[in-house]
Amino acid sequence: MTITTFAPIGAWLGSTPLSQGARAALRATSWLAPADETLHILALTTLFVSAAVVSLRLLGLVGHDHHAGRLARRLLPLTWSALAVLVLTGGLLVLNRPGRYFRSDMFIFKMGFVLLAVAWTLALQVGLSRGESYWEQTRGRQITARSGAVFALVLWSGAIICGRWIAYA
């Protein structure tokens, strides 16, 4: 089964000056494509590690000497910065071949995983804005935080796996 619903978006995006400019820039240089992919992988690693550390702490598996809320508050800016770099570097990859990406099931699944993971990260941050111990104050919040931590690990892992499969699907 192939998801073709998004193919018209890829066709439209490919006809835009932005996409044409991205293709021209990538063709004009020998270093831009590998530099973009390298930055994409480094940002992905940064994002995943920061999300994994927070998730593993919320699960109580690491960092028992660090308050979960304080740790998350320190790492979330790194997570958001890495996500911004991922959007820019991934955007260049997509703009170069939008038709291919928007016809790819793996790309659509990846974007779904990313959107859900970002939504959870926002929810985590909203809770932390109410206090560093927000997720530890009640048993229900602890269960939500732990479930969300597993959810985040699954979502970010799914995004990474689908991202790698885009090249081969």
Model-derived features: where do they sit?
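Polytopic transmembrane helical bundles with strong interfacial aromatic enrichment
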Residues: 1-169
